[in-house]
Amino acid sequence: MVKSILASVLFAATALAASRMTAPSGAIVVAKSGGDYDTISAAVDALSTTSTETQTIFIEEGSYDEQVYIPALSGKLIVYGQTEDTTTYTSNLVNITHAIALADVDNDDETATLRNYAEGSAIYNLNIANTCGQACHQALAVSAYASEQGYYACQFTGYQDTLLAETGYQVYAGTYIEGAVDFIFGQHARAWFHECDIRVLEGPSSASITANGRSSESDDSYYVIHKSTVAAADGNDVSSGTYYLGRPWSQYARVCFQKTSMTDVINHLGWTEWSTSTPNTENVTFVEYGNTGTGAEGPRANFSSELTEPITISWLLGSDWEDWVDTSYIN
């Protein structure tokens, strides 16, 4: 009986950790050779903006140096990166890189390596980087500008402003997010970060992970980081207490870290003001629940608080969240 149960568990684990090495039927294939297109942008340009059917792009192994803009579509979009294990970003085989700084364009969004305006889009197993680095200041890897967007087992890397979670309901699951300054930021999105690995870089003497820009009580914006990890990126020597969980870009900022493991890179205060001249702390919602590790130890800033129970994904995203979220990535 024990052997039978063990065999069933191992079978289930194997099934969950499936590879995705071939394109599904009907997908537009991007490949260095032999595909429908040799750039991701060309594949996106081939999408119908009027069809209400689900469209799929499959990207084969390789490094693609380009800025990708996905416009608003009438139907759902699925983008798959080739991978040996769909459950983890560590097996991703597709890298999308570009280097644009804010100084070169009109706004933050235009610096992003991936600019996604497609509502109802699901992005799987892509490594997306803005390689501009510290000297460029604001330089995004991903700009998420629509609702019902899901990012699964992806990897986002940058320095400042890595991820702009800007509009609508969004999910980031099993995803690696790396940066140094305000690298999860935005104004209006309700975003659920599920089992993400958040990694900080050496360089700044003091910096924050999140910068939520909710500017009024009526705005829906809320970032919830759930069952995730916070630590220094591999190869980075980050001093104890260098980082804060967040600072308020606007005066009604809302961020929650819950059931998340934190190393000592997090300052004991947990949260910090926007600046000494503009603290923006009077109306913030900076909360935690059940965090662990040295970085979870206080005393915390007096404008933050501890919840008595965790926020649920259904409260944040609505009772119909399972209609658009890939629940196989949500435990």
Swiss-Prot record:
Residues 1-17 form the signal peptide. The keyword Chaperone does not apply. It is an enzyme of class 3 (hydrolase). Keywords: Aspartyl esterase, Cell wall biogenesis/degradation, Hydrolase, Secreted, Signal. Pfam families: Pectinesterase (PF01095). Pathway: Glycan metabolism; pectin degradation; 2-dehydro-3-deoxy-D-gluconate from pectin: step 1/5. GO terms for cellular component: extracellular region. The record marks 160 as: Transition state stabilizer. The keyword Nucleotide-binding does not apply. It catalyses: [(1->4)-alpha-D-galacturonosyl methyl ester](n) + n H2O = [(1->4)-alpha-D-galacturonosyl](n) + n methanol + n H(+). Its EC number is 3.1.1.11. GO terms for molecular function: pectinesterase activity. Substrate binds at residues 138, 247, 249. The active site is at residues 161, 182. One of its GO terms (biological process) is pectin catabolic process. It is found in: Secreted. Involved in maceration and soft-rotting of plant tissue. Belongs to the pectinesterase family. This is Pectinesterase. It comes from Aspergillus niger. The gene is pme1.
